[in-house]
Each structure stands twice: as structure tokens, then as C-alpha cells.
Regions:
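N-terminal "arm"/small-domain region of PLP-dependent enzymes with the aminotransferase-like
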Residues: 1-33
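PLP-dependent aminotransferase-like
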Residues: 71-163, 167
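Short alpha-helical
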Residues: 19, 42, 64, 89-90, ...
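Pocket-edge positions in alpha/beta enzyme catalytic cores
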Residues: 13-16, 32-35, 104, 111, ...
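Active-site "gating" loop of Rossmann-like NAD(P)-dependent oxidoreductase/epimerase domains
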Residues: 166-174
Length: 174
């Protein structure tokens, strides 16, 4: 008989097959260009087509992707970036990497995503962006958040790392 403390709920399960192993082995044996080889361009093109975007840039992590986005927009000291109160640490770390300040906003109870109704009270003259995060494949009310960012001339940077494959009103997230 198992005790409750012996029960484990898996956070994820990795599925691979022989083709996956062969492709990875081929890349490793090539000995160079692991991160910039032709497979990366093929992957970026596939993602662009899948989500319906004009651009795709592969980085090593979601943290790096957020950090690069914040740098590209020129966020820095004294700027405020609204983030969900329930998020992965990358959202806050990337904000701090550019010396901006994270401003935590409430989440929706049904998606655990950023609650659009809580954003307005968090906006100040220092606010530069809103960063909703898709959690566990569920997207927040992104259309309402987009409207708020447009009305307040703020950047909308979607952290859709956990939402790849999800869609809202027929449009892929991210």
C-alpha cells in the first residue's frame, strides 16, 4: 500500500522516438554550429508558419527572449513593467536585468493569466509595458489586455512560452 507522500504527480513527461535521437546525435556529432546550424533556420520557419508571424528568432530560453525584448524596446532604470502576480521567475528576472521595476498585477481565476481588469490601477507615468504570461497552455484575456496597452501607448510583450499551440479566437498566441 502506498502512502500519500509516495504519490507523485508528474510535471511533464518527455516523449522521444528513434528519429529524435538520430537527429540530435547527428547535430552533436557535427561538432560545431549546434546553436546556429541549418536546423535552427528550419525550426524558426516552421514556428513562423505555425503561429502566423512574420518573424521568429530562436534564443536559448524564455528568460533570454524576454530580456532581449526589453533591451530592444530600450526599457531601463525607473521604468515599470506590469507582470502577473503568478508567473515564472523569468518574467521578473528579465525586468530586473534591464534595471526596470516589475509591478505585480492580479490574475484570472480560470486561466491563472494576467487579469485585464486589474491592469488599469497599476499604470503610472513610468509604465512602459505589460507582460501577460500564458500558463499551462491557457491564454488570458489577451484581447482586453491588448486594448488597454493600445489605449495607454504601452508595449505588449506576450510570454507565450507555455502557450505554444494555444489559440484565442482562431489566432495562435504569442
Amino acid at each position: 500500500k502506498k502512502e500519500i507522500s509516495d504519490w507523485k504527480i508528474p510535471l511533464y513527461k518527455i516523449y522521444t522516438d528513434d528519429e529524435d535521437v538520430q537527429l540530435i546525435t547527428k547535430i552533436v556529432r557535427r561538432g560545431s554550429n549546434w546553436a546556429i546550424g541549418p536546423e535552427i533556420e528550419e525550426f524558426e520557419e516552421s514556428i513562423k508558419n505555425y503561429v502566423g508571424s512574420d518573424y521568429c528568432l530562436t534564443l536559448n530560453s524564455g528568460t533570454s527572449a524576454l530580456h532581449a525584448s526589453f533591451l530592444a524596446y530600450g526599457f531601463g532604470t525607473g521604468d515599470e513593467i506590469i507582470v502577473p502576480s503568478f508567473t515564472f521567475v523569468s518574467t521578473v528576472n528579465a525586468t530586473r536585468f534591464v534595471n526596470a521595476n516589475p509591478v505585480f498585477s492580479d490574475i484570472e481565476t480560470n486561466t491563472f493569466g494576467l487579469d485585464s481588469e486589474s491592469i488599469n490601477s497599476k499604470i503610472t507615468s513610468k509604465t512602459k509595458a505589460v507582460v501577460p504570461m500564458d500558463y499551462g497552455g491557457s491564454s488570458c484575456d489577451i484581447n482586453s489586455i491588448k486594448k488597454i496597452t493600445e489605449e495607454n501607448n504601452l508595449k505588449l510583450i506576450e510570454d507565450a512560452a507555455e502557450g505554444l499551440g494555444s489559440s484565442v479566437n482562431g489566432k495562435k498566441v504569442g
